[in-house]
Amino acid sequence: MAGALALNTYKTVSIAVTTGLTTAYTAPNGVSSIHLFSAVSNISSGVSTVTVYYNKSGTQFELIKNAKIPTTDVLNPIVGSLVLEVGDKIEIEGSANNAMKFTMSILESAK
């Protein structure tokens, strides 16, 4: 079947965290998305803070707010699975530009 969507696709998203709100992932049409793992690493020489949001239909829900991450440490902002429906987003913002990196693994399953 040409052009058929794979049944299960694993994806990893990695972005630099900035002071502006950034969308790390948006759940696409035609799949069910499940958050498997995420981590925010502080690559700076000082303490940084991060806020991670789940955005559903334009409404933000803070998953973790102003969490302090010591220098060269890592925070797992979303513990466990999180089901993302079409258009749902994971958004992130930090206390300084390029002081942290966010990595997230997602399983997309064809509907």
In which residue ranges do the predicted regions lie?
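Short, acidic/polar linear motifs in exposed loop/turn regions
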Residues: 43-44, 96
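Noncatalytic modules at the cell exterior or secretory-pathway interfaces
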Residues: 82-96
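A short beta-strand element within beta-rich, extracytoplasmic domains
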Residues: 33-42, 89-92
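Short, surface-exposed beta-strand/strand-loop-strand elements in extracellular ectodomains
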Residues: 45-66
